C-alpha cells in the first residue's frame, strides 16, 4: 500500500517546504501542486546548485517522479513555459514527467495588469501582492467567468470567451485605473501558441492521481504559501487568494480526505512574513536584523526582504488544529546559533491585561495585542549541517523539546541547512 502525504507551511509561507518536498520525493513516485500560482517560490539547493521552482512541483529534480499541477492552481502559461525551458536548459526532462489539469484557471496578461494597477491605486493601503495576477485570476474563477486550460484547445470558444472577458477587464483598466488596454489579437495569437506547447501535457489530474493510488504508489502533495495566508483562515485581508490549508488538497486536486495518511507541517525555528499585515512577534531591533541576515530572508520570487520575529506558538497551535497536522518539520535552526536568549510566544495580552491563548480572526484585532514570551537560553555552538539529534547542542535540543511540549505534537524532521543532506529525520512520513 502506498502512502499519501501532504506537506504545507504552518506560518506565513517561506518555511522551507521546497527542500523538504525534494528530500521526501526519494520515497515518492508522484508529487502534486494543488493550489496557488507562480507567486510562491520553492528554493532547492542540491550539490551547491540553487534552483527556484514557482509552478513546477519540487519532485521534478528527481528523474523517476511524475509531477502534476492540479486544478486548484491558477496557471500562467507564460510563466510555466518559461520555467520548463529554464529547467530543460539544465538538462532536466520536464515535458515527459509533467502533467497539467485541464481545469486549471488561466492567468492572462489582463490579470497581471489589474493586479499591479490595484496595488498602485491603493498606495499605503496595498496588500503587498507579488503583482503576478493571482488574485484577479481567482476572482474570475469564483465569478464563473475564468478561461481554463481546457479552453485553449477550442479556438473559436476560446476566442469568444476572451473577447467578452477583455471587454469587461479593459473597461476597468482604462476607465477606473486609467491604464492601457490589453490587446485582443496579440493575446489570442500568443494563447494559441501556448496551446500547442501545453497540449501534450494536459490530462484529468484527479483521475490520474486515483490510478496512482490504486497502484499503491506514494503520492506527495506540495502546498504553497502558509496557513496564515489562507483566504479564510489567514490574517485577512493580508492573505493570498487561495485556500492554503490541508482542505485545499481535496478540492484543488480532487482527492478525498480519507485517502490522506499524514500531514507534515513545516515551520521555521523562528517566524517570518513578507509584505503587510499583523506580526505579533516581529523584531525591529538588531536581533531581527541578525536573523534576517543569517537566514538570508529575501523572497525567492520577489526578492523582497522578509520581516523576522520570534517563534509564535499561538499561531502554530491553531495551524495544527486547522490541518490535523501529524508531525512538524522545523527548519533553519542553524540561524539561531549564537543568540544568548531565545523567546517563544506562548500567549497574547490585550490592552486590558487579558491573556489570549488563540489568535484573533481578523488582522485589525491584532493591533493592540502583545506577545507573552517564555525565555530559553540560546547556544553558541554551530548546528549547521548536523544530521544526528544527539549531536545538537544541549540548549538546542531543549528549545526543540519545549516547542514539542507547548504544541503537543512531535517534531519528526529537522532541517539544519539548505542541502538535502542537512536534515535530521526522526520519523519518515512515508513509513
UniProtKB/Swiss-Prot annotation:
Chief subcellular location: cytoplasm
Annotated compartments: Cytoplasm
Entry keyword annotation includes Zinc-finger: no
Names of the cofactor(s): Mg(2+)
Biological pathway: Purine metabolism; AMP biosynthesis via de novo pathway; AMP from IMP: step 1/2
Note describing how the cofactor binds: Binds 1 Mg(2+) ion per subunit.
Residues reported in the UniProt entry to bind substrate: 300-306
UniProt binding sites for IMP: 14-17, 39-42, 130, 144, 225, 240, 304
Sites where the protein binds GTP: 13-19, 41-43, 306, 332-334, 415-417
Any single biological process term in GO: IMP metabolic process
Residues annotated as the enzyme's active site: 14, 42
Enzyme class: ligase
Catalysed transformations (reactions): IMP + L-aspartate + GTP = N(6)-(1,2-dicarboxyethyl)-AMP + GDP + phosphate + 2 H(+)
Function statement: Plays an important role in the de novo pathway of purine nucleotide biosynthesis. Catalyzes the first committed step in the biosynthesis of AMP from IMP.
Oligomer status and interactors: Homodimer.
Protein name as it appears in the record: Adenylosuccinate synthetase
Species per Swiss-Prot/TrEMBL record: Legionella pneumophila (strain Lens)
Classification lineage: Bacteria, Pseudomonadati, Pseudomonadota, Gammaproteobacteria, Legionellales
Amino acid at each position: 500500500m502506498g502512502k499519501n502525504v501532504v506537506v504545507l507551511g504552518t506560518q506565513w509561507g517561506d518555511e522551507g517546504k521546497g527542500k523538504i518536498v525534494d528530500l521526501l520525493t526519494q520515497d515518492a513516485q508522484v508529487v502534486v501542486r494543488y493550489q496557488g500560482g507562480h507567486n510562491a517560490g520553492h528554493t532547492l539547493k542540491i550539490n551547491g546548485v540553487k534552483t527556484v521552482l514557482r509552478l513546477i512541483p519540487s519532485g521534478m529534480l528527481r528523474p523517476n517522479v511524475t509531477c502534476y499541477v492540479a486544478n486548484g492552481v491558477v496557471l500562467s502559461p507564460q510563466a510555466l513555459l518559461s520555467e520548463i525551458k529554464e529547467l530543460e536548459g539544465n538538462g532536466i526532462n520536464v515535458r515527459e514527467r509533467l502533467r497539467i489539469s485541464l481545469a486549471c484557471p488561466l492567468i492572462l496578461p489582463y490579470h497581471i495588469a489589474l493586479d499591479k494597477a490595484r496595488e498602485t491605486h491603493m498606495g499605503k493601503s496595498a496588500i503587498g501582492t507579488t503583482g503576478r495576477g493571482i488574485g484577479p485570476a481567482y476572482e474570475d474563477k469564483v465569478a464563473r467567468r475564468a478561461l481554463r486550460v481546457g479552453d485553449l484547445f477550442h479556438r473559436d470558444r476560446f476566442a469568444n470567451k476572451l473577447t467578452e472577458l477583455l471587454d469587461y477587464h479593459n473597461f476597468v483598466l482604462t476607465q477606473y485605473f486609467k491604464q492601457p488596454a490589453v490587446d485582443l489579437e496579440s493575446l489570442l495569437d500568443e494563447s494559441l501558441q501556448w496551446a500547442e506547447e501545453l497540449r501534450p501535457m494536459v490530462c484529468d489530474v484527479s483521475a490520474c492521481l486515483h490510478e496512482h493510488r490504486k497502484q499503491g504508489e506514494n503520492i506527495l502533495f506540495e502546498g504553497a504559501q502558509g496557513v496564515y495566508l489562507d483566504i479564510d483562515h489567514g490574517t485577512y485581508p493580508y492573505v493570498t487568494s487561495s485556500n492554503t490549508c490541508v482542505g485545499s488538497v481535496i478540492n484543488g486536486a480532487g482527492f478525498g480526505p480519507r485517502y490522506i495518511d499524514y500531514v507534515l507541517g513545516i515551520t521555521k525555528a523562528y517566524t517570518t512574513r513578507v509584505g503587510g499585515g499583523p506580526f505579533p512577534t516581529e523584531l525591529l531591533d538588531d536581533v531581527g536584523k541578525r536573523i534576517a541576515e543569517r537566514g538570508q530572508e529575501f523572497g525567492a520570487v520577489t526578492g523582497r526582504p522578509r520581516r523576522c520575529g520570534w517563534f509564535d506558538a499561538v499561531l502554530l497551535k491553531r495551524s495544527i488544529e486547522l490541518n490535523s497536522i501529524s508531525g512538524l518539520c522545523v527548519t533553519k535552526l542553524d540561524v539561531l546559533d549564537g543568540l544568548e536568549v531565545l523567546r517563544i510566544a506562548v500567549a497574547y495580552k490585550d490592552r486590558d491585561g487579558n491573556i489570549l491563548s488563540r489568535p484573533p480572526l481578523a488582522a485589525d484585532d491584532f493591533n493592540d495585542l502583545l506577545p507573552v514570551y517564555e525565555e530559553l537560553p540560546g547556544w553558541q555552538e554551530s548546528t549547521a549541517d548536523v544530521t544526528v539529534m544527539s549531536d545538537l547542542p544541549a540548549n538546542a535540543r531543549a528549545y526543540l523539546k519545549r516547542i514539542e511540549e507547548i504544541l503537543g505534537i512531535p517534531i519528526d524532521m529537522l532541517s539544519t541547512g539548505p542541502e538535502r543532506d542537512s536534515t535530521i529525520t526522526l520519523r519518515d512520513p512515508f513509513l
